[in-house]
């Protein structure tokens, strides 16, 4: 089983993205593929879940561990498969979904593709009260993007090793995030220029 993949995002299609990792392209189904567009041709970290069936081996990808945890909880419900779970995650505000489950809001739950009244009731029965305050509430892809930018992470670690404080680096991190696709060295040079201003 895989926990996550670090690789270059090389392709986006309506239902999948492709991550190139050491010359192998991994086809990964994700909730909102085009939300990954800003990270095209950059190194990303994507959390994955592998589903092995008789006729296929499939990878499902997530922005963060919370989104993956939500997916795993959803597929544990009878009547919800991996594709339905991804559709629910794509269509939902995760916090609203969790509140609907905890408050037995069947009407809200039946608005999702493939979720009828019976499945919604099963979701409430199986999942109500099983989410902690942080356990499965997702964050947006843009919030998670810096975690997926390995070159930027390496640059920040290198600057900290050189003695720069985390508070100093936090001030310029947003500006650096806007410069997608740079190497670690280029991020370091850019950071030093920003701190000299």
From Swiss-Prot:
Q: Which UniProt keywords are given for this protein, alphabetically ordered? A: Cytoplasm, DNA damage, DNA recombination, DNA repair, DNA-binding
Q: Sorted alphabetically, which Gene3D superfamilies does this protein's record hold?
A: 5' to 3' exonuclease, C-terminal subdomain (1.10.150.20), DNA helicase RuvA subunit, C-terminal domain (1.10.8.10), Nucleic acid-binding proteins (2.40.50.140)
- Give the residue ranges for region: Domain I: 1-63
Q: What is its main location?
A: cytoplasm
Region spans: Flexible linker: 142-146
**A GO-annotated cellular component:** Holliday junction resolvase complex
Q: Where is this region: Domain II?
A: 64-142
Name the segments for region: Domain III. 147-197
Q: Does the keyword DNA repair apply?
A: yes
Tell me the CDD domains matching this sequence: UBA_RuvA_C
One Pfam family of this chain? RuvA_C
Q: Where in the cell is it found?
A: Cytoplasm
Which GO BP terms apply?
DNA recombination; DNA repair
Listed GO MF terms: ATP binding; four-way junction DNA binding; four-way junction helicase activity
Q: From what superkingdom does this record's organism come?
A: Bacteria
Provide the assembly information: Homotetramer. Forms an RuvA(8)-RuvB(12)-Holliday junction (HJ) complex. HJ DNA is sandwiched between 2 RuvA tetramers; dsDNA enters through RuvA and exits via RuvB. An RuvB hexamer assembles on each DNA strand where it exits the tetramer. Each RuvB hexamer is contacted by two RuvA subunits (via domain III) on 2 adjacent RuvB subunits; this complex drives branch migration. In the full resolvosome a probable DNA-RuvA(4)-RuvB(12)-RuvC(2) complex forms which resolves the HJ.
Q: What is known of its domains?
A: Has three domains with a flexible linker between the domains II and III and assumes an 'L' shape. Domain III is highly mobile and contacts RuvB.
Q: What does this protein do?
A: The RuvA-RuvB-RuvC complex processes Holliday junction (HJ) DNA during genetic recombination and DNA repair, while the RuvA-RuvB complex plays an important role in the rescue of blocked DNA replication forks via replication fork reversal (RFR). RuvA specifically binds to HJ cruciform DNA, conferring on it an open structure. The RuvB hexamer acts as an ATP-dependent pump, pulling dsDNA into and through the RuvAB complex. HJ branch migration allows RuvC to scan DNA until it finds its consensus sequence, where it cleaves and resolves the cruciform DNA.
Family membership? Belongs to the RuvA family.
Query: What's the name of the protein?
Result: Holliday junction branch migration complex subunit RuvA
Question: Gene for this protein?
Answer: ruvA
């Amino acid at each position: 089983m895989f926990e996550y993949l670090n690789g270059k995002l090389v392709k986006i299609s309506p239902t999948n993205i492709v991550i190139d990792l050491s010359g192998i392209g991994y086809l990964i189904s994700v909730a909102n593929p085009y939300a990954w567009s800003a990270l095209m041709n950059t190194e990303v970290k994507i959390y994955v879940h592998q589903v092995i069936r008789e006729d296929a081996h499939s990878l499902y990808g997530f922005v963060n561990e919370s989104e993956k945890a939500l997916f795993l909880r959803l597929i544990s419900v009878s009547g919800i498969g991996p594709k339905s779970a991804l559709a629910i995650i794509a269509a939902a505000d995760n916090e609203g979904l969790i509140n609907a489950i905890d408050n037995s809001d069947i009407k809200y739950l039946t608005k999702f593709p493939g979720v009828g009244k019976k499945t919604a009731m099963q979701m409430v029965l199986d999942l109500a009260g099983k989410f902690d305050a942080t356990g499965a509430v997702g964050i947006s892809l843009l919030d998670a993007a810096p975690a997926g930018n390995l070159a930027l992470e390496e640059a920040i670690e290198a600057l900290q090793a050189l003695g720069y404080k985390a508070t100093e680096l936090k001030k310029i991190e947003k500006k650096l995030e806007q410069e997608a696709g740079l190497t670690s060295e280029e991020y370091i040079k850019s950071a030093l220029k920003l701190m000299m201003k």
